[in-house]
Amino acid sequence: MNATASLSKAASLIADPSRSAMLWSLLGGESRPASELAMLANVSPQTASNHLRLLLDAGFLKAESAGRNRFFKLAAPTVGVALESLAAASSRESKLCDAAQISRR
């Protein structure tokens, strides 16, 4: 897969509000159970399971089993850095767009 296709796939995964909420809740480096991630994303456990599988398959997350529970965390610090960078860039872009709209009035 070339770089642009890889970037597009990653962006489409992050673009989903439920998945981005799950990823954002893991930025602190801790592991969270699927049930907690479902609650944080305001989705059913079944829906969360589907989202988590996609994030695992993409390499954004890793999972560890403890008893009957699976705990998820970011696969690498670079995932968190990328998420924070995207959030900062989109925030700056939003502020620039707001400023441009105000100056046109």
Regions found by a protein language model. Give the residues of each.
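Short, hydrophobic-biased segments on the C-terminal half of alpha helices
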Residues: 52-53
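Short amphipathic alpha-helical segments, especially helix-boundary/capping motifs
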Residues: 10-11, 45, 59, 100
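N-terminal helix-turn-helix DNA-binding core of bacterial DNA-binding proteins
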Residues: 5-44, 70-77
